[in-house]
Amino acid sequence: LLISPYSMYRYDASYALEVFANYPTRFGLIKPFNPGDADVGDQVSRWADIPGVVGARIMLAYESQFSADHGGVKAIMHAGAAAGIPVNILCWGNLDKAQEIARQHPNTQMIIDHLGLKQPFEPPVPTGGFDNLEQVLALAAHDNVAIKITGACTLSTKPFPYADIWSPLEKLFTAFGFERCLWGTDWTRATCLLTYRQAVEAFRVTDSLSVAEREMLMGGALSAIYGWSPG
């Protein structure tokens, strides 16, 4: 999936749309929306009608002024449900808001980005990267919430294959079930911390996953939740 990067393009998905036009069988598209826009619900509806679109996104980690009760947040969630597309939530530092959004919108498929945990862009890796894990685990109580296991390797304080990530990840797998866990590398953010190959191989070489668990985590759950797979 190709998520239009907020850090580079804010709410403009032009580049992601250009990439999709060149490689229409390779990518599904997700873009962030500004809850402060008066017509944001209509924006989501129009976005959902574009070929290749599979989701929307709310950037609570960077737009923390928006509460769960904000009209724009509600509009995005309602529009996502009406269009049948998931809404991704980047919510590190705002897990309480994510909990309330999930409670208020049980009919909207919600995806927690980046494990719900703040992750580094460059070394050194901070200690205590999984300190807020219990708050993340609490989100599993909502059936409409799934979680992306993106960037997990960037929270490791060990070298490849990052042996210290598996204890916290196993808690997530138990809480959510593999059918609600979506693997990803987040490599474009993590280029200063690991290679793309390392981000993939860490999940392929581990004996912490069965064949069936690995297949669900590394594609099966994503295809089911987003209704998309590469052409």
What is each residue range found by the language model?
Residues 1-11, 202:
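An N-terminally biased module of ancient metal coordination in phosphate/nucleic-acid-related enzymes
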Residues 9-13, 65-66, 119-121, 155-156, ...:
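Short catalytic/ligand-binding loop motif for oxyanion handling, primarily in non-cytosolic enzymes
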